[in-house]
């Protein structure tokens, strides 16, 4: 299967409405599965295995930390807030979920404790908050982070790692055996707020994915909505039952998809920009242009090499046409088609002889007729 450096493999890029339905199913199917499982005890069996649980959360942590490493490395060079915030959200999931596994009763003699239940909620709430802040580059948090990205990256990362290590070593510390007053209400509020936030952020990235079919945008949709499904399972699933294991599966799927997007992007471009640079794109026009195949850009480059006089004309026409389409709120597929058609409107020039295109003087009637016929070659 061939692919484009700008996004998904071609077969995947053509999912169209079917892909949209599959993504929307992520919002519905987990909830239905949870309700059925909780209503029919036979479908929600007890599956107690602390060691296997540690393996699963370690896999989640590895995927999240891989994404964090890539986005943090890019953030140091780029200096914008979005990659810093996404890196911090993934660091929180990575270290806290690993701490969740290490505080599980029965692992290395760990006693019953509250941190095994607290860490997943804190990690996913942090992830949701970071994604929401990253989606608003003009917001106060983004402006603060952009002012000193290295400090904004380093200090929270170290704090999260140290705090996770502390409770993993001794899960009885910091009220690890006794609930603090109001803890249940705070937990519920965090779960609800995080789920709503991830629903909205996922919808934003879904819109961007529809415009450009960009791999990293699809990864953010999956990570957002699968994490939202995980929160639902975390809230209503019963400890050690299948309904509780579901949230681990959703998290692993979401962060594995994000890790795949990063690795595939890097393999295709051999640069961090190619791997995660799409997370800094905010202009819808950029998403549309970013989603066009490399062959199209190469073709227009060949046309403009033949006619330097109109260099950049195709890109300008495509930009204006696309902005009009966006203002008219056309469907994403129509906007992408409009951009592509406008970008290619002068491709017929490639069949016009160079002696005519680059003639220093006036064109004779026959030459002028050939120039006027160039759209026929489009």
Sequence positions of predicted segments:
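Alpha-helical transmembrane segments of multi-pass membrane proteins
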Residues: 22-42
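Aromatic-anchored segments of alpha-helical transmembrane domains
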Residues: 30-35, 92-99, 160-168, 224-234
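Short, charged amphipathic alpha-helical "coupling" segments at sensory-output junctions
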Residues: 283-294
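Short, Lys/Arg-rich, polar N-terminal cytosolic tail immediately upstream
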Residues: 1-15
């Amino acid at each position: 299967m061939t692919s484009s450096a700008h996004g998904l493999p071609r077969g995947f890029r053509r999912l169209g409405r079917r892909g949209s339905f599959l993504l929307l199913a992520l919002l519905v199917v987990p909830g239905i599965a949870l309700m059925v499982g909780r209503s029919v005890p036979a479908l929600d069996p007890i599956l107690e295995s602390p060691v296997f649980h540690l393996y699963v959360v370690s896999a989640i942590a590895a995927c999240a930390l891989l994404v964090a490493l890539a986005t943090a490395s890019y953030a140091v060079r780029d200096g914008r807030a979005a990659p810093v915030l996404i890196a911090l959200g993934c660091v929180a999931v990575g270290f806290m979920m690993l701490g969740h596994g290490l505080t599980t009763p029965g692992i290395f003699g760990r006693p019953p404790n509250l941190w095994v239940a607290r860490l997943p909620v804190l990690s996913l709430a942090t992830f949701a908050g970071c994604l929401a802040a990253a989606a608003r580059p003009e917001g106060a948090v983004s402006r603060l982070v952009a002012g000193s990205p290295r400090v904004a990256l380093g200090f929270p990362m170290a704090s999260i790692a140290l705090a996770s290590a502390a409770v993993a070593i001794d899960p009885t510390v910091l009220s690890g055996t006794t609930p603090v007053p109001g803890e249940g209400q705070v937990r519920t509020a965090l779960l609800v707020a995080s789920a709503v936030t991830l629903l909205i952020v996922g919808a934003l990235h879904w819109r961007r994915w529809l415009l450009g079919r960009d791999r990293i945008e699809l990864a953010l949709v999956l990570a957002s909505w699968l994490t939202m499904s995980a929160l639902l399972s975390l809230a209503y699933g019963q400890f050690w039952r299948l309904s509780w294991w579901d949230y681990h599966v959703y998290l692993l799927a979401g962060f594995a998809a994000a890790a795949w997007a990063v690795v595939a992007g890097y393999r295709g471009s051999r640069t961090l920009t190619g791997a995660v640079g799409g997370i800094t794109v905010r202009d819808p026009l950029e998403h549309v242009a970013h989603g066009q195949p490399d062959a199209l850009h190469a073709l227009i480059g060949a046309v403009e090499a033949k006619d330097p006089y109109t260099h950049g004309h195709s890109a300008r026409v495509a930009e204006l046409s696309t902005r009009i389409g966006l203002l008219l709120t056309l469907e994403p597929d129509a906007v992408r088609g409009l951009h592509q058609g406008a970008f290619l409107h002068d491709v017929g020039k490639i069949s016009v002889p160079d002696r005519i295109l680059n003639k220093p003087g006036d064109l004779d009637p026959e030459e002028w007729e050939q120039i006027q016929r160039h759209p026929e070659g489009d």
